[in-house]
């Protein structure tokens, strides 16, 4: 039986493929509080604060006992009475939930991420598969549907969300190492929206765009993210280094397994008189004293790296 909290909380019987939903939001909060300190006694005072957020009823002890009994009944439905007694242990002044890491979807997720991390450099294909399976455990937000988290639930949710962010970083690294840059573009864009201050996601998106032959869009990611990230962190070393690679057309942008060999195509011969000029990435820098001027991509990069503000025209 598995305690699932990566989404709406429930108890899941893996052999019979049956889920036992908890019967009230208070039970959901209680489960989250106990899983924030697995195999450790959680004092009653903290459980009361978790369930009622400082507005506890007069008979708080009796009300808490009622919710503990309700949770124990739910566990008994999923695992039997003996299992419920072994899981939920009442101690001096508190309650303990006994679980192993594999008894919860959160624990399984963290174990899988740790296993994938050790394989990312030596076996990125394996790491990619492990991370895909691990991320599929998420059915929604942590403890979804319980309303505002109490202090313990909030700590648990923040901890698991941070591991999920790390898992996505590892997944994208594995994807970029195995030629799956085009496959993760939409997920990378979503990650930069969900985590706008995570420089790593923006850097990975720039690399994925370059390897998909969309270097101009990669520069756009830089220009959009630079001010925001600089204001938050003071500097953007990853994005600046990636921009320099684009300007130099570094081999890093076409690593083994990439399906597109370079971020920008090689220069074309000048057009003969009367022929249409080839399409180029052009930038208008309207702050120059000599008026609007069309500039090459490398000139644009020079200004970007020097920190000047630019106004771009259409590509």
What are the residue ranges of the model-derived segments?
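DNA-recognition element of transcription regulators
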Residues: 23-32, 57-79
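Short boundary/linker motifs that mark transitions into or out of structured domains
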Residues: 1-26, 86-94, 264-270, 278, ...
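DNA-binding patch around the recognition helix
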Residues: 1-3, 66-100, 232-235
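Short acidic-capped amphipathic helix/loop micro-motif used as an active-site/signal-coupling element
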Residues: 94, 112-151, 233
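Alpha-helical adaptor scaffolds
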Residues: 149-195
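A short linear beta-strand->loop->alpha-helix hinge motif most characteristic
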Residues: 82-120, 161, 243-247
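Short amphipathic alpha-helical recognition elements used for nucleic-acid or partner binding
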Residues: 19-51, 71, 200-203
């Amino acid at each position: 039986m598995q305690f699932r909290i990566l989404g709406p909380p429930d108890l899941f019987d893996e052999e019979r493929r049956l889920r036992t939903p908890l019967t009230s939001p208070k039970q959901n909060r209680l489960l989250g509080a106990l899983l924030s300190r697995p195999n450790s006694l959680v004092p009653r005072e903290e459980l009361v604060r978790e369930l009622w957020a400082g507005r506890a009823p007069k008979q708080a002890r009796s009300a808490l006992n009622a919710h503990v009994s309700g949770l124990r009944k739910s566990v008994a439905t999923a695992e039997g009475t003996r299992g419920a007694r072994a899981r939920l242990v009442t101690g001096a002044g508190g309650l303990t939930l006994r679980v192993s890491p594999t008894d919860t979807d959160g624990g399984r997720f963290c174990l899988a991420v740790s296993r994938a991390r050790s394989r990312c450099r030596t076996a990125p294909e394996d790491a990619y598969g492990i991370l895909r399976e691990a991320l599929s455990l998420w059915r929604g937000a942590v403890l979804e549907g319980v309303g505002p988290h109490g202090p313990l639930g909030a700590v648990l949710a923040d901890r698991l969300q941070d591991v999920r962010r790390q898992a996505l970083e590892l997944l994208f690294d594995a994807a970029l190492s195995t030629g799956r840059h085009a496959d993760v573009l939409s997920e990378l864009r979503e990650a930069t929206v969900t985590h706008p201050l995570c420089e790593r996601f923006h850097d990975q998106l720039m690399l994925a765009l370059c390897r998909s032959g969309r270097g101009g869009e990669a520069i756009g990611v830089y220009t959009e993210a630079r001010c925001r990230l600089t204001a938050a962190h003071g500097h953007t070393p990853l994005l600046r280094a990636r921009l320099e690679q684009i300007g130099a057309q570094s081999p890093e942008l076409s690593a083994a397994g990439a399906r597109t060999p370079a971020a920008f195509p090689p220069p074309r011969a000048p057009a003969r008189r009367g022929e249409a000029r080839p399409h180029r990435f052009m930038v208008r820098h309207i702050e120059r004293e000599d008026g609007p001027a069309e500039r090459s991509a490398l000139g644009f990069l020079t200004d970007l790296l020097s920190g000047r503000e630019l106004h771009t025209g259409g590509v």
